[in-house]
């Protein structure tokens, strides 16, 4: 056994290095980058020293500033309007939407409430009288809903949408029609008499029972009222609408119902109807001509035989249409029912919302639990409620997440030595990050950036995880500062060593989120901007306020106070003799591979007069062979970490009696230095790492081909809820969307009729457009208008031929003949407006099916005023609206003959139904076809665009991938520039960007394997992943650049320095994300928790496995090298007086160094801080 050497036996020519020895630039290195680095680090050093000097003031002012910004949350606005959240900013869709609102206003024509009925058993048939009876029960319960608001009772008949209520000159008949006119309800029950039960209107006539649709025969009623009133015009209106006997002429589902009318086809036979046969082809409302509900709107999951006959269906759907808030407000404005409540549009909206919520509730409870069928109810208010609940801040999850992070930070930073522990720093750091997040969001509110679901559900946790990373980094670096650093410079030294890393990560994160704002979806643009601002506030808090907290904690540690409970002194504070390097004298240690360990044997005893433990450090030392060094002497260069106090435990027997416990020095840094780095940097391990990541990249490239576009509404709604069940059933059975083809102004409609017909034909031929029945004309205003003109032309021709209409009189003709007479004599010339010679020389519609241009706008005025049902069915929504014009056949004055022309149209629309849209590819195909049709029409001079929810929410997918690639490329370039500027090494910046690009590709591929579809939300996360990935890579890269020696040595040193803070940062991010897993929304779990968790794990693997291996193989040369001042004797060979260790300098390692390590066992504690009390050594024997 080799006898330990005394200090006097050290090699004679060793000169200890000065602490402030300046770094020397390597040969061939650029001096400008190093000067810039030195200048930047000098600024950080100065900042840290100033903050430490005025830590109390900085902390107070910082908390006040951040607290003031956090008050901005009081003015935060949460946006839940889908159009405001998802329509692309500045896109053609937003411009088209603006044009529509400019012409028609904010509100749609009506709102929809839907009931879907399916069998409990999968695939069960609903085309049975029993199933229809259950549907009637649910629909009837829903239609009888009443709510009381503002002292009034509101039922369906008051708030429902009524299509084309005609104006009748007879006051009594007009009031009766107003009360009786049916609501628009699209239901399969309209094929039967029971559909009348859903209509709640009633009227009273003397001598008759209450008139309701269940007992109303319009033909019989007109015959009874004929002798008492002139109803010829009203009769013609009903005949044109093909009302017939209305509901009383339809079969009864239950022919045994005592109220089933005698006119029902199966009333006398008492036979149940053939439900499949009756529903085949759809149903009609009270008007057979204008109210045809196509089969696809009523039945889902249908099956047919070989002849095309309907056999069965799996779902039924009924749709109740309500007025919009504006329509309801206008309808009751000035009415006697609302004159005393200050009627407003907001009140109208509240009435509709209350009725819709009650509608959904009662409909879902209508059927008994043991029924064979189930009802799914939904309304537009339900969707708003979902979005509102989706956007609410979950206080429980926020508080739980932050408490979990507080606990983790406190436990992670606790140490055995109370004076060295940093639990309070961890608590204060997390609370500071929470305040920074609140202040960032408050600043966003003050800047007018609206909040949305992503802001409230995701950002608090994501920002917490990212912000705490830098807290761990600074705290870790602060405890590992060189022990001989003067006390006033501790904070400056900490910022000088870690400020660059913090700046790099924060700037890259901000740039990443700002680049993510390139995605033109308002909700995600707001989220990206808010995230960037929050990261900026975190950066300011970490760089300015947190150093003040560390400085205060330094004072506590210097005074040997307890952690957390800083008012109490530490019971385990030690008094230690501080052994300075100068005590070694001017002796020099030759440079070689040998590991020089100066082991100071420490003995402790407790003084009788004090409770303090006194440590005596006798001057002894010995040399040991470094057999336990995993990487050889190369790992322990002066450029490496100086955190190996307590790492040497030489000696046996009584000298080892005070050896510390293993758990006292086993840390992540210890693991990285002694286990992880030696294993990772072996040649075979490097090959395995490169092979693994190459295979992962290859699999990810394949997975990227599996990623589909899309985001279904079912992904947003919580699973297991009734709303999710409805949306799933609707997507499966009734994937129908109402759209419109809008024609704008800027062209002459009268001379472009052929182009309009061609446009309609091209649009109708699209695969996704549901064609009308073969027996029904297209449902557009231009077709209805032309058909109406042809009808009155035929009536005129008949009256002219019979002599009831002559050149000078039309009083004996029919109502339609008289209208045609007035139109035919119009010239359109203001000087000579009438020309009676045209009665026989012109037609209202020519042989080509076109309306004469000079008659077009005057005929439009007459049609709008005379055919309200046709106008309502066409959904034309003319702007400017044609003027009102009343026709009186018996008024033959010249003024009555003149017809005012409508103003040139600036807005009109053709309605269509799209069906079969299940996947995003189906939507994209339909959108592209519609856009192509509009482009072709534009070449013919017709300005048109498609409108509807598919174009609002799915058109983003046309350019989403291009936008994604553009944002990623721009961000990678920006990341390269930022890293190259702050690291002053384009070589290193290139390696970082390579790793980040690999992470993005791999995350995209893993999304494909997980079945996560690509929408604007994953695009934001993918773009932001580049910035977040910098957290895991730049620390290792910076540690590699600032280390000395070979690539392996510098990679090991970088891992030792950064393994702990990077791991702590990843764990803190995962803890922040963990609270997202408790969300009620699968959307949050799948698209945020899963994706961000995968991103964090990928970042950890790439930062601690791939990047060190790449740096050890392809890393840039060191920028600086620390050179010790040595005497010439150091370079000569020498041998110790005792023992077999050689001090030869190996020729292959010209820059090898000896390392002097102070190891001592002081009640499990490292040496004290600079300036600690030093007790004089006693003469206690060894």
UniProtKB/Swiss-Prot annotation:
How is it placed in the membrane, per its record?
Multi-pass membrane protein
Which segments does the topology annotation call Extracellular?
79-394, 450-457, 523-531, 708-963, 1013, 1086
Q: Which residues are glycosylated?
A: 370, 812
| Expressed in which tissues | Expressed in epithelial cells of the developing hair, tooth and whisker.
Show the GO cellular component annotation of the record.
membrane
Sequence intervals crossing the membrane = 58-78, 395-414, 429-449, 458-478, 502-522, 532-552, 687-707, 964-984, 992-1012, 1014-1034, 1065-1085, 1087-1107
| PROSITE patterns, per database record | SSD
Where does this polypeptide localize? Membrane
Query: Which keywords does this Swiss-Prot/TrEMBL entry list?
Result: Glycoprotein, Membrane, Receptor, Transmembrane, Transmembrane helix
Protein name in the entry = Protein patched homolog 2
In its UniProt entry, the species of origin is given as Mus musculus
Q: Quick one: which gene encodes this? A: Ptch2
């Amino acid at each position: 056994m080799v006898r330990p050497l005394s200090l006097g036996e050290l090699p004679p020519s060793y000169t200890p290095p000065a602490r402030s020895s300046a770094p020397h630039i390597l040969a061939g290195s650029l001096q400008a980058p190093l000067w810039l680095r030195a200048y930047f680090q000098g600024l950080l050093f100065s900042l840290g020293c100033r903050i430490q000097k005025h830590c109390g003031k900085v902390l107070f002012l910082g908390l006040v500033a951040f607290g003031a910004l956090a008050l901005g949350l009081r003015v935060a606005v949460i946006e839940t309007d889908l159009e405001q959240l998802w329509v692309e900013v500045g896109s053609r869709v937003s411009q088209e939407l603006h044009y529509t609102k400019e012409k028609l206003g904010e509100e749609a024509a009506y709102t929809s409430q839907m009931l879907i009925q399916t069998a409990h058993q999968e695939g069960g048939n609903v085309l049975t009288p029993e199933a229809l009876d259950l549907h009637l029960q649910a629909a009837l319960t829903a239609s009888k809903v009443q709510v009381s608001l503002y002292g009034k009772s509101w039922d369906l008949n008051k708030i429902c949408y009524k299509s084309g209520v005609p104006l009748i000159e007879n006051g009594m008949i007009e009031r009766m029609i107003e009360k009786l006119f049916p609501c628009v309800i699209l239901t399969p029950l309209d094929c039967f008499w029971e559909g009348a039960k859903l209509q709640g209107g009633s009227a009273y006539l003397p001598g008759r029972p209450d008139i309701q649709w269940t007992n109303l025969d319009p033909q019989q009623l007109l015959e009874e009222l004929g002798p008492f009133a002139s109803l010829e015009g009203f009769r013609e209106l009903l005949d044109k609408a093909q009302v017939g006997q209305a509901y009383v002429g339809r079969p009864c589902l239950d022919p045994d119902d005592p109220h089933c009318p005698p006119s029902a086809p199966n009333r006398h036979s008492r036979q149940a109807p053939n439900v499949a046969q009756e529903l085949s082809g759809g149903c009609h409302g009270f008007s057979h001509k204008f109210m045809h509900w196509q089969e696809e709107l009523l039945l889902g999951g249908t099956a047919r035989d070989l002849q095309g006959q309907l056999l069965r269906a799996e779902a039924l759907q009924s749709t109740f249409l309500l007025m919009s808030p504006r329509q309801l407000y206008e309808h009751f404005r000035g009415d006697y029912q609302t004159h005393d409540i200050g009627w407003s549009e907001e009140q109208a909206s509240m009435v509709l919302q209350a009725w819709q919520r009650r509608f959904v509730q009662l409909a879902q409870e209508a059927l008994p639990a043991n029924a064979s069928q189930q009802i799914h109810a939904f309304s537009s208010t339900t969707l708003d409620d979902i979005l509102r609940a989706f956007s609410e801040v979950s206080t429980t999850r926020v508080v739980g997440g932050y408490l979990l992070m507080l606990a983790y930070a406190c436990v992670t930073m606790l140490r055995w030595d109370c004076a060295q522990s940093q639990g309070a720093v961890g608590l204060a750091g997390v609370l500071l990050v929470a305040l920074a997040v609140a202040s960032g969001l408050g600043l966003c509110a003050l800047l007018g950036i609206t909040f949305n679901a992503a802001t409230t559900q995701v950002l608090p946790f994501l920002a917490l995880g990212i912000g705490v990373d830098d807290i761990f980094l600074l705290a870790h670096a602060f405890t590992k500062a060189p022990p001989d650093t003067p006390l006033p410079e501790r904070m400056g030294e900490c910022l000088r060593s870690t400020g660059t890393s913090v700046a790099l990560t924060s700037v890259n994160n901000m740039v990443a989120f700002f680049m993510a704002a390139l995605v033109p979806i308002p909700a995600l643009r707001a989220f990206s901007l808010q995230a960037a601002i929050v990261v900026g506030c975190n950066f300011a808090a970490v760089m300015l306020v947190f150093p003040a907290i560390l400085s205060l904690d330094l004072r506590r540690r210097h005074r040997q106070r307890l952690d957390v409970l800083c008012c109490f002194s530490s019971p385990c504070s030690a008094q230690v003799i501080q052994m300075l390097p100068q005590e070694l004298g001017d002796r020099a240690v030759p440079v070689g591979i040998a590991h020089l360990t100066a082991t100071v044997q420490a003995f402790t005893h407790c003084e009788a007069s004090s409770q303090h433990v006194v440590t005596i450090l006798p001057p002894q030392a010995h040399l040991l062979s470094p057999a336990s060094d995993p990487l050889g002497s190369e790992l322990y260069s002066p450029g490496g970490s100086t955190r190996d106090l307590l790492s040497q435990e030489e000696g046996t027997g009584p000298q080892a009696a005070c050896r510390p416990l293993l758990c006292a020095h086993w840390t992540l840094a210890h693991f990285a230095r002694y286990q992880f780095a030696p294993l990772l940097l072996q040649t075979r391990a490097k090959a395995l790492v490169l092979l693994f990541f190459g295979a992962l990249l290859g699999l990810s490239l394949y997975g990227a081909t599996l990623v589909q576009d899309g985001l279904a509404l079912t992904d947003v709604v919580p699973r297991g809820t009734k709303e999710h069940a409805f949306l799933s059933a609707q997507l499966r059975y009734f994937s129908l969307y109402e759209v419109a083809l809008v024609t704008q102004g800027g062209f002459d409609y009268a001379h472009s009729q052929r182009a309009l017909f061609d446009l309609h034909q091209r649009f109708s031929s699209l695969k996704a457009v549901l064609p009308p029945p073969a027996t029904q004309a297209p449902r557009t205003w231009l077709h209805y208008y032309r058909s109406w003109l042809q009808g009155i032309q035929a009536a005129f021709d008949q009256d002219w031929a019979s002599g009831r209409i002559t050149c000078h009189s039309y009083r004996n003709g029919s109502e339609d003949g008289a209208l045609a007479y007035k139109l035919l004599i119009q010239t359109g010339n203001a000087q000579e407006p009438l020309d009676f010679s045209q009665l026989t020389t012109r037609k209202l519609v020519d042989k080509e099916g076109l309306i004469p241009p000079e008659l077009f706008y005057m005929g439009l005025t007459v049609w709008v005023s005379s055919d309200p049902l046709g106008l309502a069915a066409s959904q034309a929504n003319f702007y400017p609206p044609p003027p009102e014009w009343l026709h009186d056949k018996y008024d033959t004055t010249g003024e009555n003959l003149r017809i005012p022309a409508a103003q040139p149209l600036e807005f009109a629309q053709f309605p269509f139904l799209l069906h079969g849209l299940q996947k995003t590819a189906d939507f994209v195909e339909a959108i592209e076809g519609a856009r192509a049709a509009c482009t072709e029409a534009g070449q013919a001079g017709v300005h048109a665009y498609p409108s509807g929810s598919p174009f609002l929410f799915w058109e983003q997918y046309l350019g989403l991938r291009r936008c994604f690639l553009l944002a990623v490329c721009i961000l990678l370039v920006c990341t390269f520039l930022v890293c190259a500027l702050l690291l002053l090494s384009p070589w290193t910046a290139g390696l970082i960007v390579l790793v980040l690009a690999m992470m993005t590709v791999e995350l995209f591929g893993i999304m494909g394997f997980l079945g996560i579809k690509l929408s604007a939300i994953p695009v934001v996360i993918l773009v932001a992943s580049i910035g977040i990935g910098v957290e895991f890579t730049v620390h290792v890269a910076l540690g590699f650049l600032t280390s000395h020696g070979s690539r392996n040595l510098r990679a090991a040193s970088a891992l030792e320095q950064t393994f702990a803070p990077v791991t702590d940062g990843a764990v803190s991010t995962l803890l922040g994300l963990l609270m997202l897993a408790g969300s009620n929304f699968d959307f949050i779990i799948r698209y945020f928790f899963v994706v961000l968790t995968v991103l964090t794990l990928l970042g950890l693997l790439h930062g601690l496995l791939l990047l060190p291996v790449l740096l050890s193989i392809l890393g840039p040369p060191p920028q600086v090298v620390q050179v010790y001042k040595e005497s010439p004797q150091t370079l000569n060979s020498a041998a110790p007086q005792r023992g077999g260790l050689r001090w030869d300098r190996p020729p292959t390692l010209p820059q090898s160094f000896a390392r002097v390590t102070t190891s001592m066992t002081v009640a499990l504690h490292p040496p004290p801080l600079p300036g600690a009390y030093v007790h004089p050594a006693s003469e206690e024997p060894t």
